[in-house]
Design a protein with these regions (language model features):
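Catalytic cores of DNA base-excision repair glycosylases
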Residues: 3-224
């Protein structure tokens, strides 16, 4: 079985340096909203457009003219109305909780509790904010990361998504050192690979740098031969 470290080295060689999510909590929240059902390229284009307005603070989200805000958010792809609603709901939440950054930097339990009411973020988004924004050693097992890890054999397969996520997180926790940088690197590259190459349907296996050691790809190849 391919080691996680070897897999990450190959992904780094294939994709080159990847930009991590912003570490400022509200900007990271905006990043998550733009990232929802989108591609990294579209997400980054929309974030850059909001930065140019500028509209990357809770107050500026509300002060920006609707047409300007819509034009920027539309760059992230479909679901524009849902994204706008999520941005405004998040802006309200952050204005009501000006001490959020301090709470996130406390204990992991305190950080989780601080984000519990921010429903638009979701579990993976909350964990990503805790990892990249507050240096807590959690694994943000979003759908992309979970799919890639599972296909590589990290985490026992399960038809139950929640159980699969738990299995994946346990397997990655056992395979990764406790260092925050190592966990950020794993989260960044596994999730990115799942969003652009190791797709849920019709994955781009011929170009994948992990192909020769991927048990799922081998099983598929054997089924067709």
């Amino acid at each position: 079985m391919l080691s996680l470290d070897e897999a990450l080295q190959r992904l780094h060689a294939f994709y080159g340096p990847l930009t991590p999510p912003p570490n400022e909590p509200f900007i990271m929240y905006v990043w998550e909203v733009l990232n929802f059902h989108g591609s990294p390229v579209r997400r980054d284009a929309a974030l850059a457009a909001l930065r140019r307005i500028p509209a990357l603070t809770p107050d500026s989200i509300w002060k920006t003219a609707p047409k300007k805000l819509e034009a920027a958010v539309l760059l992230a792809g479909p679901y524009m109305d849902d994204r706008i609603k999520a941005l405004r709901a998040g802006a309200d939440f952050f204005r009501r909780h000006p001490d959020l950054s301090q709470r996130l930097s406390g204990t992991l339990l305190a950080g989780r509790r601080a984000l519990r009411s921010l429903r638009q973020l979701g579990l993976a988004g909350s964990h990503r904010m805790l990892l990249f924004g507050a240096a807590h050693p959690v694994i943000p097992a979003d759908a992309h990361l979970t799919r890639v890890a599972s296909r590589l054999g990290f985490g026992a397969p399960s038809a139950n998504l929640r159980r699969q996520i738990r299995n994946t997180r346990r397997a990655l926790n056992a395979s990764l050192p406790p260092a925050i940088d190592a966990r950020r690197r794993a989260a960044l590259y596994l999730s990115h690979h799942g969003s652009v190459t190791c797709l849920e349907f019709d994955p781009h296996c011929p170009v994948c740098p992990l192909l020769r050691d991927c048990p799922t790809a081998r099983a598929r190849s054997a089924a067709f031969n």
